[in-house]
Regions:
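Transmembrane beta-barrel strands of outer-membrane/channel proteins
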Residues: 55-61, 99-105, 149-155, 213-217, ...
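Short loop/turn motifs that connect adjacent beta-strands in outer-membrane beta-barrel proteins
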Residues: 25, 30, 37-53, 86-99, ...
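Residues on the lipid-exposed face of transmembrane beta-strands in outer-membrane beta-barrel proteins
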Residues: 55, 81-85, 136-140, 199-203, ...
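Outer membrane beta-barrel
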Residues: 72, 76-220, 317-321, 331-357
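Signature for the C-terminal beta-barrel architecture of outer-membrane proteins
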Residues: 182-313, 329
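Outer membrane beta-barrel transmembrane domains
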Residues: 226-235, 245-247, 261-278, 294, ...
Length: 425
């Protein structure tokens, strides 16, 4: 198998490039846009020449205060380091494109699995606890400026299935931040940091309307497999997943973003509740982010409403439906222009066939099956405090209703307090 790198040396080298000059001049640490600054002018010069370094850290601490499995705390973290090569600037060419290289590392412990027992992760950055290559891609326009093509090794969720505005990452639960989880839970769809070989096309009809189409390899054996961390080619390709997405962005007045999407994975899958195979599985989704109010007295202060509705294959997906809605207030106070207040509600519906299988297994073993609701529900409230241009602190509270809806376990509703720390390196 082709391996891009054999160990963590690439991640350490990239981290060293970003962090070594970090504190050469720490006097402006509270004012600069990144923690490590401009590296004595080197960083800006490299970007002007066509090489842009980026780095992001997120740390999430959660404490289960009531209900769930037990009272305790857990911490998880994500470190992302990347470099973008602008070939136009580097070689003096026109429309030569860009190359993106990204490495990711995750560490920590599972708040949902250890403390709550629910399906929707209370830490959006938990999972796949190892260092990996997460993107090696090439992007450029083709034939016309309206058509953008990207190909290589990348997470399909980087460009599809989520709101471009990023409004949902004002929350810490993975049910909100990212993409509807029934996409990846019931097909070959992959979200960051899981990457696959693929190609993505974007065609802009005008500034408001766009269509996106992609095709990605499906390789279940590489999911969460640290031995595949640096391998680009699939270990065992079972099929191809093809998403199609229509995007509308309201640009005048109160801004808005709307996405209507469909996807299909032609891999064979086992039908839930039997040994039969299903030829393919798919789903569809609707996403929206709409500003509904904007202050006339305070520039930048606005109230947004968001919504998600997603359905997956009823034959082969254990996670059949996801709905969410909520509000985000930007600039809650005149003195806090970059802060946010977010309140959201989500409902995750397990496949009824999965519940039937759980009930049948319990009866076959002479056990009673608990009386459970037909969905796991989530209420989350957070406050995003922009401490410096590069540092965000987000205290958070989550209330998980029916945590055992997916596992078929009788678990008390859980109250979880959390703190998310995000830093641009």
């Amino acid at each position: 198998m082709f391996s891009v790198l054999s160990d963590r040396r690439a991640a350490l080298l990239l981290a060293a490039c970003c962090l070594t000059p970090a504190f050469a001049n720490a006097s402006d640490v509270f004012d600069r846009s990144t923690l490590t600054g401009d590296w004595g002018g080197l960083r800006n010069q490299l970007e002007a020449d066509g090489i842009r370094f980026t780095g992001d850290y997120s740390g999430e601490t959660v404490y289960n205060a009531d209900g769930g499995l037990k009272r305790s705390a857990r911490y998880s973290q994500n470190l992302k380091l990347g470099v973008r090569f602008d070939l136009d600037k580097l070689y003096g060419l026109d429309n030569a494109g860009v190359v993106q290289l990204t490495i990711n590392d995750r560490r920590g412990n599972d708040g949902s699995g250890d403390l709550v027992g629910n399906r929707l992760p209370v830490q959006e950055n938990f999972g796949g606890l190892y260092t990996r290559l997460t993107e090696l891609s090439y992007e450029r326009s083709l034939f016309t400026p309206a058509l953008d093509v990207k190909l290589g090794y990348m997470a399909m969720g980087n460009d599809l299935g989520g709101l471009d505005s990023g409004i949902l990452c004002n929350f810490m639960n993975a049910g909100f931040c990212g993409h509807p989880l029934n996409m990846s839970g019931g097909s070959g769809w992959t979200n960051y940091p899981n990457a696959r070989l693929g190609v993505r096309l974007k065609y802009s009809f005008n500034p408001a309307w766009q269509v996106r189409v992609a095709a990605f390899a499906v390789d279940p054996e590489s999911n969460g497999n640290s031995s595949r961390a640096w391998h680009v080619t699939p270990k065992h390709k079972t099929g191809t997943v093809v998403p199609v997405e229509l995007v509308y962005k309201k640009l005048d007045g109160l801004a808005g973003e709307y996405k209507l999407g469909w996807y299909y994975d032609n891999s064979d899958a086992t039908r839930i509740g039997s040994n039969e195979k299903v030829a393919g599985r798919g789903g569809h989704y609707l996403l929206l982010d709409q500003a509904v109010w904007q202050s006339s007295a305070l520039s930048g202060q606005s109230l947004h409403v968001f919504g998600q509705a997603a359905a997956a294959s009823s034959a082969a997906s254990p996670f059949s439906k996801w709905y969410s809605t909520g509000v985000v207030l930007k600039q809650p106070f005149a003195s806090r222009p970059n802060d946010t207040v977010a309140l959201g509600f989500g409902r995750a519906v397990p496949n009824p066939r999965s519940r039937e299988v759980q009930e049948q297994n319990a009866l076959a073993n002479g056990q009673d099956f608990p009386s459970l609701g037909n969905a796991e529900r989530l209420i989350e409230l957070s406050y995003g405090y922009q401490a410096t241009p590069w540092l965000m602190l987000r205290p958070d509270v989550q209330y998980i209703i029916e945590p055992g809806a997916f596992s078929g376990s009788d678990i008390d509703n859980a109250l979880v307090f959390g703190l998310q720390v995000k830093a641009s390196l």
